[in-house]
Amino acid sequence: MQPESGANGTVIAEFILLGLLEAPGLQPVVFVLFLFAYLVTVRGNLSILAAVLVEPKLHTPMYFFLGNLSVLDVGCISVTVPSMLSRLLSRKRAVPCGACLTQLFFFHLFVGVDCFLLTAMAYDRFLAICRPLTYSTRMSQTVQRMLVAASWACAFTNALTHTVAMSTLNFCGPNVINHFYCDLPQLFQLSCSSTQLNELLLFAVGFIMAGTPMALIVISYIHVAAAVLRIRSVEGRKKAFSTCGSHLTVVAIFYGSGIFNYMRLGSTKLSDKDKAVGIFNTVINPMLNPIIYSFRNPDVQSAIWRMLTGRRSLA
């Protein structure tokens, strides 16, 4: 990210984030709402992580991935919300270019790992339902760790690629971002150099990072649905659909908001719709995930309850 002298000779070394609302009277309301959402998200995800760690009944591949997903949700919301709350308190909207790039990198890192981890969870459900006899060998602890490590490696490469590509652009004014965090679409519109290569890179990498995992998830659940429909027990079908339904809900929200956000780079002006999608990506998704998984999962509910009441599992 190359700061350059603008028309008046000043050097662009920072960006101005306008935030969600410009009305001063509504800033305290925004602060309270986002602080509440942040605390609920952190507590909910850490509760699931703690339950997975201490409850023997949850020491399975599915909950191993769920625990990792909880860590990612905490990381994702922590990249954007605390800095926004800090700006609301200090009433300072300026963000240095370096801090903007750092936020961009970590946001895409956590979102990228999330993308691959959701695919690993779909693969786990496919093996558990469609290949139950070989499930324990195909989804061993070594395989689980390899899937998580590969997710982090791919996401790190993706985040670093976009960050380095963004650092090559020139910014010579204006420097006002009509958003509450730094991301690719907003920065593209402020660049005074061509962003065609960056946008092409975003679409190409996005196809690999999002298109391939999405296709694998769809294929996995087509096989899962076919296998579940062959189950004679009504209770068995209900349990299988309940487990898969939670995951599919999270996948739909995650990919739906992501596609809307990054596939609209041709728009000439960012609107409040982009802010709403940004809230979904950074706040709503991490907050809903523990609610979705625990609400429809009696094992997680009972594990969290036993952990809170100090009771031990009989398993």
Swiss-Prot record:
Organism from which the protein derives: Homo sapiens
Glycosylation sites noted in the Swiss-Prot or TrEMBL record: 8
Role: Odorant receptor.
One GO BP annotation of this record: signal transduction
Protein name: Olfactory receptor 3A1
MF terms in GO: G protein-coupled receptor activity; olfactory receptor activity
Keywords: Cell membrane, Disulfide bond, G-protein coupled receptor, Glycoprotein, Membrane, Olfaction, Receptor, Sensory transduction, Transducer, Transmembrane, Transmembrane helix
Protein family (similarity comment): Belongs to the G-protein coupled receptor 1 family.
Localization: Cell membrane
